[in-house]
């Protein structure tokens, strides 16, 4: 999980808790889901946290949560946004692979080294998490005073404008960060360490994403910014731009940054994003609304709460809430833009629980006393396994994943053939390996693969397995039906149908079931040496001597007899 470094003194100052000791602060942070991992060489706290709360990737976000926890703040405080003075114009030449952009201006900052480090850390942590290592969203932070914009928007309104467009890889030059030479974008990918790291994100594009002002190219997203607009401790006004593959993602990343800089006293100024056919005003700091029922909150947490208490707890979580008492008691909950983790009413219930204090919840024994025990199926499985071992079989546990070649081709079957009552195998959409493309529909092919891999060992080899098999069944909620299958093989120079049947009948006797073996045909077995397994009048499997074609496919030089049947056929 992500680890964030936080200056404890900075955290105390922002959260207005200067009197808190380190131990008290660590306990309060743990209550927020932030676990203390240690201290850096500079004395900063290293905090690990669940990656759902991305607004806590910076000291400003953590301090905000502590202020709510201590009651210093309540409800939602949306930073004021001044009217747009700048426009990002999106040109038609922008690569289709990265078509979206957003931005904001932040003025009046007074960044020292600690604050600048916090901003850089927030940028990089957002890249690593929500931005999917810059693939889904990348952030550029620039010194606004170094930009020169001009022109007007497509709607005719005057504006200082920069342009997001495509650039030829060997086209315009700029000086990238941490460099002193002008380079084309292609040269950046070849010669700059950051270009080598993130070059794969634009690999194969005819035109690379680029951002221009009136002076020229100053940003090559998602790879690197130009040195002309580099931010340092003397910078007071920032221009923030984000590009990506999804508008919602980069807008939410921008909201998290704007809230963090607003906590530093920054004044947010909107930016118009001109797509030609539409113009967006960003940042989008508007709230969203979700509804949660009072009954759901009480049932999930196991506590009785008054409606006013729930509203109070939600406001202490940084949310706004209004109770609706008409009919079932529900709450209309407003969620700030930086809370990208609130996707479902369950997330709101979690906030109520944390504000209430999970340590305050009192465990209670259930009204109905129950005694745990093993499932009957598990008991049966163990009993059959012990019986197989007693009959001389070696117990195996094979992979449930296999390939259609192993299931069908090497067993002399076509996909339409019936292998022990199996249905069509469940297939893997994007298999990691061609050896594991389907879930097995019967277990005998797995045992033959083991025999194939052990031809160098002495015979006899008597192997058995009780394992899961599956088939497509559209009547099931998952479209897949699973059951446990019992399979065994006898491999030796004198292996025969009679050897396998004797073991099968011994299993039937041990469990008090009537097993009959009427003759049948099966492509995997020798004609006339194959039978169906019928248990208490119900077809359950197959038994026989494996066909020479199957033995040759598996490089086996001794006869093999085998059987397979459904485990649940032995149940009472």
Swiss-Prot record:
Residues 285-363 form the B5 domain. Belongs to the phenylalanyl-tRNA synthetase beta subunit family. Type 2 subfamily. InterPro entries: aa-tRNA-synth_II/BPL/LPL, B3/B4_tRNA-bd, DNA-bd_dom_put_sf, Phe-tRNA-ligase_IIc_bsu, Phe-tRNA-synth_IIc_bsu_arc_euk, Phe-tRNA_synthase-like_B3/B4, Phe_tRNA_ligase_beta2_arc, PheRS_beta_core. Keywords: Aminoacyl-tRNA synthetase, ATP-binding, Cytoplasm, Ligase, Magnesium, Metal-binding, Nucleotide-binding, Protein biosynthesis. It comes from Natronomonas pharaonis (strain ATCC 35678 / DSM 2160 / CIP 103997 / JCM 8858 / NBRC 14720 / NCIMB 2260 / Gabara). GO terms for molecular function: ATP binding; magnesium ion binding; phenylalanine-tRNA ligase activity; RNA binding. GO terms for cellular component: phenylalanine-tRNA ligase complex. It catalyses: tRNA(Phe) + L-phenylalanine + ATP = L-phenylalanyl-tRNA(Phe) + AMP + diphosphate + H(+). HAMAP family: Phe_tRNA_synth_beta2. Disulfide bonds: none annotated. Its EC number is 6.1.1.20. It is found in: Cytoplasm. Tetramer of two alpha and two beta subunits. GO terms for biological process: phenylalanyl-tRNA aminoacylation. Its main location: cytoplasm. This is Phenylalanine--tRNA ligase beta subunit. Its cofactor is Mg(2+). Mg(2+) binds at residues 341, 347, 350-351.
């Amino acid at each position: 999980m992500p680890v964030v470094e936080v200056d404890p003194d900075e955290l105390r100052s922002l959260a207005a808790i200067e009197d808190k000791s380190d131990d008290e602060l660590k306990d309060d942070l743990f209550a927020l889901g932030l676990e203390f991992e240690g201290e850096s060489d500079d004395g900063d706290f290293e905090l690990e946290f669940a990656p759902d709360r991305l607004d806590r990737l910076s000291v400003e976000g953590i301090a905000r949560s502590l202020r709510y926890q201590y009651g210093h703040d309540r409800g939602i405080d949306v930073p004021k946004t001044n009217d747009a003075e700048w426009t990002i114009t999106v040109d038609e030449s922008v690569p289709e692979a990265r078509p979206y952009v957003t931005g904001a201006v932040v003025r009046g900052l007074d960044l020292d080294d600690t604050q600048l480090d916090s901003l850089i850390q927030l940028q990089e942590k957002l890249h690593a998490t929500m931005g999917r290592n810059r693939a889904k969203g990348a952030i550029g932070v620039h010194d606004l005073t170094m930009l020169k914009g001009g022109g007007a928007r497509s709607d005719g309104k005057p504006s200082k404008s920069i342009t997001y467009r495509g650039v030829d890889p060997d086209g315009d030059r700029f000086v990238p960060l941490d460099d002193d030479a002008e380079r084309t974008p292609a040269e950046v990918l070849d010669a700059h360490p950051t270009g080598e790291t993130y070059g794969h994100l634009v690999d194969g594009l005819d035109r690379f994403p680029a951002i221009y002002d009136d002076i020229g190219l100053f940003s090559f997203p998602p790879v690197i910014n130009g040195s002309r607009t580099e931010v340092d401790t003397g910078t007071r006004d920032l221009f923030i731009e984000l590009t990506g593959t999804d508008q919602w993602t980069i807008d939410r990343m921008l909201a998290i940054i704007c809230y963090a800089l607003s906590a530093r006293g920054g004044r947010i100024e909107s930016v118009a994003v001109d797509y030609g056919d539409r113009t967006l005003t960003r940042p989008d700091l508007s709230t969203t609304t979700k509804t949660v029922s009072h009954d759901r909150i009480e049932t999930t947490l196991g506590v009785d709460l008054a409606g006013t208490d729930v509203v109070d707890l939600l406001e202490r979580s940084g949310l706004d809430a209004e109770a609706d008492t008409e009919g079932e008691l529900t709450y209309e909950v407003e969620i700030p833009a930086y809370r990208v983790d609130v996707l479902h009413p369950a997330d709101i219930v979690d906030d109520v629980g944390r504000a209430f204090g999970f340590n305050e919840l009192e465990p209670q024994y259930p009204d109905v006393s129950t005694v745990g025990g093993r499932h009957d199926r598990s008991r049966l499985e163990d009993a059959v396994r012990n019986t197989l071992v007693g009959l001389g079989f070696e117990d195996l546990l094979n992979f449930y994943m296999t390939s259609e070649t192993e299931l069908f081709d090497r067993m002399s079957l076509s996909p339409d053939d019936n292998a022990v009552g199996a249905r069509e195998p469940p297939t893997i959409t994007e298999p990691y390996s061609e050896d594991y493309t389907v879930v097995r529909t019967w277990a005998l092919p797995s045992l033959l693969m083991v025999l194939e891999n052990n031809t160098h060992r002495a015979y006899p080899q008597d192997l058995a397995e009780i394992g899961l098999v599956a088939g497509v069944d559209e009547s099931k909620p998952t479209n897949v039906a699973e059951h446990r299958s019992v399979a065994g093989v006898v491999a030796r120079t004198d292996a025969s149908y009679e050897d396998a049947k004797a073991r099968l009948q011994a299993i039937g006797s041990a469990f008090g079931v009537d097993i009959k073996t009427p003759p049948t045909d099966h492509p995997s077995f020798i004609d006339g040496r194959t039978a169906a397994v019928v248990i208490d009048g119900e077809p359950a499997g197959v038994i026989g001597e494996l066909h020479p074609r199957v033995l040759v496919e598996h490089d086996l030089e001794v006869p093999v007899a085998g059987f397979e049947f459904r485990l649940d056929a032995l149940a009472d």
